[in-house]
Amino acid sequence: MTDIPDPSTATLQFPGGTAEFPILRAVDGRDTVDIATFMRQTGLTTLDQGFVNTASTKSAITYIDGDQGILRYRGYPIEQVAKNSTYLEVAWLLIYGELPTAAELEDFDDRIRRHTLLHEDLKRFFDALPATAHPMSVLSSAISALSTYYEGELDVHDPEQVELAIIRLLAKLPVIVAYAHKKALGQAFLYPDNSLSFVDNFLRLNFGTMAEPYQIDPVLSKALDRLLILHEDHEQNASTSTVRLVGSTEANIFASISAGINALFGPLHGGANEAVLNMLAQIRDSGEGVRTFVEKVKNKESGIRLMGFGHRVYKSYDPRARLVKESADEVLESLGVEDPLLDIARELEQIALDDDYFVSRKLYPNVDFYTGVIYKAMGFPSRMFTPLFAIGRLPGWIAHWREANNDPATKIGRPQQLYVGPPERDWPTAR
């Protein structure tokens, strides 16, 4: 009689024997082989550069199916979330797991408003920085400095201290971003106006002046709120994984978030929307037209890259991209702006979607393709695009840090390596 393999285990044959590993069932998506005992059973390690095939953790926060173009926050489809919620409501959902009651959301909003002010000494921190400093460098430095004002309230094992730190981050990080913008412009910092909503307050801090009242544009507020929602989480990306890895050392949440900001600063992660805008401007300035540019991309001409298409996870149309495109149309129509870059983007998207070269390679527009056009129309310079991404991603970083911090199974991150250096050798006695 032939033995039937246990369907809940995976069997590995290797020189010297076999080993079995349990298969963990996912609620949705791919099941996972648990290799926690791999080294003990086999004497080997695994190599997976870029963690393409490796689940580093269990998480209940966000689900992505890249083949089907699905993104869900705590089970809710992103299309429903973006059209029916607000940034702060989604932040609560991600951090605490369920939608807040009306009373919980009101209290959450109120606590954040009451913590928007920065210590006056921290405001002077900006005086030591050059006006040319990149806002992301300013942001990561300021978040690290922010923790020094709460030295007695950083215990990662004290739930009350953790919750207060979460509120402070949500309240103060957007203010720091706005002040980095004002620093670059050489304009005076405004104090937050806590009578305004989260998004309206942020827009006023960026574009208001001491000389006159700031006029709220509800279309811009709605569009920015949606963009922030769409960026709130994307499961185990590079910056989120960085936050979790740093947090695994029991570093406080300020230090962990600062590390995530630095990871986001990398051009392969947070700088894609700025690169898209530069590409569109390059097409415009060349005078050669979109089709000529597309042919250059297909011919792999030196220095020509198609930005804003394709994604490490999505092998179909990024579900966030459709929602961003809607917002782009609404913002430019509201402002009465005719931006040739948006026209170029639309033409480029249509050509690419109809071209087998791009379709066969699963190169579809991603969330970054239209965001830069919107931010530019709002008045943000391109160097502010990644800090805006950081504001959006902050609740996701917090949610993952908190999930890992509350999980008794969390271990300090310490990957193995495949050593490929010199073998043992003797130190020369005479040189």
Regions found by a protein language model. Give the residues of each.
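Non-transmembrane, aqueous-exposed alpha-helical and coiled segments at domain scale
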Residues: 2-431
